[in-house]
Amino acid sequence: MAMEGYRGFLGLLVSALLVGFLSVIFVLIWVLHFREGLGWDGGALEFNWHPVLAVTGFVFIQGIAIIVYRLPWTWKCSKFLMKSIHAGLNAVAAILAIISVVAVFDYHNVRKIPHMYSLHSWVGLTVLILYIQQLVVGFFIFLLPWAPPSLRAIVMPIHVYSGLLLFGTVIATVLMGVTEKLFFVLKNPSYHSFPPEGVFTNTLGLLILVFGALIFWIVTRPQWKRPREPGSIPLQLNGGNADGMEGAIAISSAHNMDAADAELSSEGAARKRTLGLVDTGQRSTM
């Protein structure tokens, strides 16, 4: 099936990948050039893993996971395969985010810095916990086969909304963290005097913001939604489409065949009962 507005989609996709990749490169340059590199010794070099892993996993990889269903080259792949890829990318993002938080706690423990005192830390830890919860719920309800279709229809709009909300909150949290870090480390020259590190890192923040905007635009265009698989029917609640943005939750064709077989069986039984009654009536009149 051809995608409507394919050239526009391709242009935005390439732009998103380019900007996201540049964001990862910029955060690496920031910590390697301006912040003395990476390490795992409880010092500042260990803390530097925090922005690197947060931008790479929680921003870039999560953004790709959000739009993976919309890649038209994957529409011939099974829905289960795409669900597995979506879940796998989100799992990688969660693991990298967890490691980034561990690096911060180690750094604070070694330096005797209080934990969880800033708004950045409050929002960041909250969104990480909710992200892991979202991943676990999605795994058990959408990836594993035993959840009833009615439950999937109820949860899907919540899953889509909360996923986008968490992604937007992650971007806001990263921008808060970048600004907070610059205020802490830029003393001479100070942040407000436009030092090279400040200008460079502000550019990183703009790249992250643009990447998020491109992902939001791609995932909210209805004409770029993955089409339903042949032989499937959408589940609807109260007359509404229950699938949110990424295609209707569908009953498989095997289920449809089972339902059809059951209907034919019931019709056959009804015909037999009718013939039996007719036969009985004929016998009573003979």
UniProtKB/Swiss-Prot annotation:
Membrane topology: Multi-pass membrane protein
PROSITE patterns in UniProt: CYTOCHROME_B561 (PS50939)
Record topological domains on the Cytoplasmic side: 1-7, 70-78, 145-151, 223-286
Pfam families from the UniProt entry: Cytochrom_B561
Any one GO MF annotation of this record: metal ion binding
Residues reported in the UniProt entry to bind Fe(3+): H108
Tissue expression pattern: Highly expressed in all regions of the small intestine and colon studied in suckling animals. However, after weaning, when iron absorption declines significantly, strong expression is retained only in the duodenum. Also expressed in respiratory epithelium.
Positions of the Cytochrome b561 domain: 15-220
Binding site for heme b 2: R70, K79, H86, H159, K225
Ranges in the topological domain labelled Extracellular: 33-47, 106-118, 180-197
Amino-acid positions noted as binding heme b 1 in the UniProt annotation, renumbered to this chain: H50, H115, M116, Y117, S118, H120, E180
A cellular-component GO term for this protein: apical plasma membrane
Keywords (A to Z) from UniProt: Cell membrane, Electron transport, Heme, Iron, Membrane, Metal-binding, Oxidoreductase, Phosphoprotein, Translocase, Transmembrane, Transmembrane helix, Transport
Family annotation (InterPro entries): CYB561/CYBRD1-like, Cyt_b561/ferric_Rdtase_TM
Documented EC number(s): 7.2.1.3
Transmembrane regions: 8-32, 48-69, 79-105, 119-144, 152-179, 198-222
Cofactor: heme b
Example of a GO biological process term: ascorbate homeostasis
Residue numbers of Phosphoserine PTMs: S232
Subcellular location(s) per record: Cell membrane; Apical cell membrane
Cofactor, free-text remark: Binds 2 heme b groups non-covalently.
Catalytic activities: Fe(3+)(out) + L-ascorbate(in) = monodehydro-L-ascorbate radical(in) + Fe(2+)(out) + H(+); Cu(2+)(out) + L-ascorbate(in) = Cu(+)(out) + monodehydro-L-ascorbate radical(in) + H(+); monodehydro-L-ascorbate radical(out) + L-ascorbate(in) = monodehydro-L-ascorbate radical(in) + L-ascorbate(out)
Subunit structure and binding partners: Homodimer.
Name of this protein: Plasma membrane ascorbate-dependent reductase CYBRD1
